[in-house]
Amino acid sequence: MIGKLKGSIEEIGADYVLVDVHGVCYVAYCSARTLSKIGSVGEAVVLFIETYVREDQLKLFGFVSALEREWFNLLQSVQGVGSKVALAVLSTLSPSELANAIALQDKTMISRAPGIGPKVAVRLVTELRNKAPAFAGDASASIGLKQELGEGVASAPVADAVSALTNLGYSRDQAANAVAAALKNGGEGGDSAKLIRLGLKELSR
């Protein structure tokens, strides 16, 4: 089984990269996010690999980090999510954004990925909410917000407040941190408008 490829980029396609490793070229299917990060033809590349072996085919999937590869596998543990849909999710959301969305039970965020309908989005945020922290990577904001909310799922006002702050130009992590601080400082039980106001106050400090 192939776990990692180190070589040079021979070709980049719409959904794959051809990697030359000492004269042997490997096709690795990747998310759009990965393809945007690996560089140009002729440059050196290192990819973490997930190998799929079927009766009639062998496919390699490439990732820029081991964390992204773990998310690829975790996503496919949910019914209705195969390799193609998992790559679409990782093309749309970074691992930290994905961890945030699951911690916040943000189905709308998940549904931005092609191939993810409402039912699959619900299954993703429900089935992965207890697994996501282990795969959060640098998504400390989502973990902090989840701790403020306790073991329950994020309320609609919380998700709306985070979404509103990101629409104002703040990063997902900044928004989640601000809402977590707002909840801690007296915003618990408030509506989205109150959380947005308190969140903006936190961000202005």
UniProtKB/Swiss-Prot annotation:
Annotated GO CC locations: cytoplasm; Holliday junction helicase complex; Holliday junction resolvase complex
Annotated segments matching region Flexible linker: 144-153
SUPFAM superfamilies in the cross-refs: DNA helicase RuvA subunit, C-terminal domain (SSF46929), Nucleic acid-binding proteins (SSF50249), RuvA domain 2-like (SSF47781)
Entry keyword Thylakoid: no
GO biological process, one term: DNA repair
Residue ranges of the region described as Domain III: 153-205
Pfam entry (one): RuvA_C
Keywords linked to the UniProt accession: Cytoplasm, DNA damage, DNA recombination, DNA repair, DNA-binding
Region (Domain II): 65-143
Subunit structure: Homotetramer. Forms an RuvA(8)-RuvB(12)-Holliday junction (HJ) complex. HJ DNA is sandwiched between 2 RuvA tetramers; dsDNA enters through RuvA and exits via RuvB. An RuvB hexamer assembles on each DNA strand where it exits the tetramer. Each RuvB hexamer is contacted by two RuvA subunits (via domain III) on 2 adjacent RuvB subunits; this complex drives branch migration. In the full resolvosome a probable DNA-RuvA(4)-RuvB(12)-RuvC(2) complex forms which resolves the HJ.
Family statement: Belongs to the RuvA family.
Function: The RuvA-RuvB-RuvC complex processes Holliday junction (HJ) DNA during genetic recombination and DNA repair, while the RuvA-RuvB complex plays an important role in the rescue of blocked DNA replication forks via replication fork reversal (RFR). RuvA specifically binds to HJ cruciform DNA, conferring on it an open structure. The RuvB hexamer acts as an ATP-dependent pump, pulling dsDNA into and through the RuvAB complex. HJ branch migration allows RuvC to scan DNA until it finds its consensus sequence, where it cleaves and resolves the cruciform DNA.
Domain notes: Has three domains with a flexible linker between the domains II and III and assumes an 'L' shape. Domain III is highly mobile and contacts RuvB.
Protein name, per record: Holliday junction branch migration complex subunit RuvA
Native species: Agrobacterium fabrum (strain C58 / ATCC 33970) (Agrobacterium tumefaciens (strain C58))
Gene: ruvA
